[in-house]
């Protein structure tokens, strides 16, 4: 909008990510709350609105909708608009002086001061006549009639009745419906918000290698075999099953057991070394089955209430068809050989790098986009992206936007264990979720500091942390050779501190045998088939199932951004809570951080956060033990053990009285 004298200032807009370069994230069903400083010189009464629309293929023809903003004080304004559909929205702010309300405000002061207001009444009549014309243009004849009649009366000599008409709030309401926006100012940026589907904010992931589904450590399983795991995963309470790469595996420089550089003839290799004579990123490993078998696996998973997430690893083995067909897509050394991949200190001799920003990048990027769309066509709507921080963020921004323009339901999880700013940049350019440093946060202060950072604005506007206590790559020190208590408490933390969490197969069996001196599993499943005994003594399957059931049935635990930490007098006990925005579901949680010994703590319950009075008695339902208690007051004593290291209390306040009984009257 062009500059005008007396312009309104619009500043401090929130949410606004990096001056509007990136979209903020929300979920369908939420309302996008927007705040801004809106002010003008003088004493004019201002009006501010949010202009918003959903971006569609016909967006250029779509009219913008407007919702009013509320004045909060100190020139701060707030408004919100609904996110009813999955996809991208645009929004901005427009504000202008409400000339008629400004006039009525000045008129009242002059009347109260006993001033002659004949001239002011004529000014008001002129303002109303302008509103009449705008009402007629808007085809609102009733409004035009009301405004016109009032304008005629204001041209009569002043009287108490006439002043009552002029100052009537109802007249100002009608006049403000047809404002003079000639002095309006529109914010100089059009901002974006992306509304993801619900699983972006609430989901529970289970990772397993389908090739080990036979569970004998010898026989390469098929997708049909892997379908046999789905009831088990469902019983554990997971709604997303994540599969490592399912494509043909290269033979050149194939890795042997425990990442050995010398593979035996029967070694299955790392599934991240993608591509062989049987095909590349659009093919499935022949020992797993066919593309039709994969589609059947996806459909069977859906029948169990489980979504399939696929690993998206944009890298190739030296045997990948791309290497021969498109050598221009790869990085070459001065001697002409193709570079192998590295993620220092790790080196991947069985993988070669794409030349992401080379002369052939347009055709490379287009092909990789077609890979994603190929798997979307097979029923995959969630991708876990391998090492995205080693590829250009420009590529991810381009790819994710392109895919979501056609398929807004597609989710992308960033597997980037790297520097904080790089991880956050990946969230900004579009990744739906991200792995986190939770894997290495074990104690009270560091857990609270980190979770407060990633679950509160501004970081939570673009970054959703998916908490994993383990991965095939990472067996953290805290879990190495640990007992079930360690696995229970870390699962409880992951599943309640965030609304999205995941674990790699074997966690429920308390598998914790490391390679000495490393954070890696011995006999890692990345390089061999594993014989999983799902009934292994000492497993915590029931604990995991109860945890996921509690998450599923209590909406407070579906929330990502409502996490709040509360006071515990024991540094070995973390106390926190979550609630739905309307307060209809509240859950308090206490988790022991000691896997070896019992811990007691005095918890200070946040009565104001609960909405409870100090003298009020309320019920708590402990979800892991299914025990109910009555609490009163702010202080509660708790004892946690390695066998029961977490307590999850759903809070119920007694609100009903006899007045609500059907026959009270």
UniProtKB/Swiss-Prot annotation:
GO terms for molecular function: hexosyltransferase activity; hydrolase activity, hydrolyzing O-glycosyl compounds. Alpha-maltose 1-phosphate binds at residues 255, 315, 350, 387, 526-527. GO terms for biological process: alpha-glucan biosynthetic process. Its EC number is 2.4.99.16. CDD domains: AmyAc_GlgE_like. The record marks 473 as: Transition state stabilizer. Keywords: Carbohydrate metabolism, Glycosyltransferase, Transferase. It catalyses: alpha-maltose 1-phosphate + [(1->4)-alpha-D-glucosyl](n) = [(1->4)-alpha-D-glucosyl](n+2) + phosphate. The active site is at residues 386, 415. PANTHER family: ALPHA-1,4-GLUCAN:MALTOSE-1-PHOSPHATE MALTOSYLTRANSFERASE, GLYCOSYL HYDROLASE FAMILY 13 CATALYTIC DOMAIN-CONTAINING PROTEIN. Maltosyltransferase that uses maltose 1-phosphate (M1P) as the sugar donor to elongate linear or branched alpha-(1->4)-glucans. Is involved in a branched alpha-glucan biosynthetic pathway from trehalose, together with TreS, Mak and GlgB. Belongs to the glycosyl hydrolase 13 family. GlgE subfamily. This is Alpha-1,4-glucan:maltose-1-phosphate maltosyltransferase.
């Amino acid at each position: 909008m062009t500059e005008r004298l007396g312009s309104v200032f619009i500043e401090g807009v929130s949410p606004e990510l990096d001056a509007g370069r990136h979209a903020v994230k929300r979920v369908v069903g939420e309302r996008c709350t927007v705040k801004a400083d809106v002010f003008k010189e003088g004493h004019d009464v201002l009006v501010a609105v949010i202009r918003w629309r959903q971006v569609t293929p016909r967006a250029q023809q779509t009219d913008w909708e407007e919702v009013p903003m509320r004045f909060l004080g100190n020139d701060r304004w707030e408004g919100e608009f609904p996110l009813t559909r999955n996809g991208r929205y645009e929004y901005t702010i427009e504000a202008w002086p409400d000339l008629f309300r400004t006039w009525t405000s000045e008129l009242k002061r002059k009347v109260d001061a006993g001033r002659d207001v004949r001239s002011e009444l004529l000014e008001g009549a002129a303002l109303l006549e302008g509103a009449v014309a705008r009402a007629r243009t808007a085809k609102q004849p009733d409004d035009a009639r009301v405004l016109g009649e009032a304008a005629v009366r204001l041209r009569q000599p002043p009287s108490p009745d006439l002043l009552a008409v002029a100052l009537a709030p109802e007249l100002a309401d009608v006049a403000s419906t047809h404002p003079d926006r000639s002095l309006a100012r529109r914010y100089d940026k059009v901002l974006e918000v992306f509304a993801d589907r619900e699983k972006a904010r609430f989901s529970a992931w289970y990772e397993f290698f389908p090739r080990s589904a036979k569970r004998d450590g010898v026989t390469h399983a098929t997708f049909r075999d892997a379908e046999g795991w789905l009831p088990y995963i469902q019983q554990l309470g997971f709604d997303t099953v994540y599969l490592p790469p399912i494509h043909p595996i290269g033979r050149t420089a194939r890795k042997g057991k425990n990442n050995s550089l010398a593979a035996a003839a029967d070694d299955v290799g790392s599934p991240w070394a993608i591509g062989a004579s049987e095909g590349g990123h659009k093919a499935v490993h022949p020992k797993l089955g066919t593309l039709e078998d994969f589609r059947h696996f996806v459909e069977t998973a859906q029948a169990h209430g489980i979504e399939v997430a696929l690993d998206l690893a944009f890298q190739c083995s030296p045997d990948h068809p791309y290497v021969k067909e498109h050598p221009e897509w790869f990085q070459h050394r001065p001697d002409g050989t193709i570079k192998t991949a590295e993620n220092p200190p790790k080196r991947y001799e069985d993988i070669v790098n794409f030349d992401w920003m080379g002369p052939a990048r347009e055709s490379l990027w287009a092909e990789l986009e077609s890979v994603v769309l190929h798997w979307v066509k097979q029923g995959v709507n969630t991708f876990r992206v391998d090492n995205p921080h080693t590829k250009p963020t420009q590529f991810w921004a381009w790819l994710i936007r392109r895919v979501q323009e056609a398929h807004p339901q597609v989710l992308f999880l960033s597997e980037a264990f790297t520097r904080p700013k790089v991880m956050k940049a990946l969230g900004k350019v579009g990744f739906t979720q991200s792995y986190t440093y939770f894997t290495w946060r074990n104690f009270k202060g560091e857990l609270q500091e980190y979770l407060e950072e990633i679950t509160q604005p501004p970081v939570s506007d673009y970054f959703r942390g998916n908490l994993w206590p383990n991965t095939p790559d990472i067996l953290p020190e805290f879990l190495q050779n640990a007992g079930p208590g360690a696995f229970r408490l870390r699962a409880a933390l992951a599943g309640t501190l965030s609304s999205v969490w995941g674990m790699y197969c074997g966690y429920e069996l308390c598998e914790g045998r490391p390679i000495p001196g490393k954070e890696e599993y011995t006999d890692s499943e990345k390089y061999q088939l594993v014989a999983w005994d799902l009934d292994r003594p000492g497993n915590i399957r029931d604990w995991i199932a109860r945890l996921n059931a509690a998450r599923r049935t209590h909406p407070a635990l579906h929330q990502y951004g409502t996490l709040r930490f509360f006071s515990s007098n024991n540094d070995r006990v973390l106390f926190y809570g979550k609630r739905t925005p309307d307060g209809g579901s509240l859950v308090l949680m206490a988790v022991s951080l000691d896997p070896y010994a019992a811990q007691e703590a005095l918890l200070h319950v946040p009565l104001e956060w609960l909405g409870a009075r100090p003298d009020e008695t309320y019920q708590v339902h402990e979800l892991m033990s299914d025990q109910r208690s009555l609490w009163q007051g702010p202080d509660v004593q708790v004892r946690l053990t390695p066998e029961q290291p977490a307590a999850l209390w759903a809070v119920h306040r007694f609100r009903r009285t006899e007045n609500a009984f059907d026959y009270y009257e």
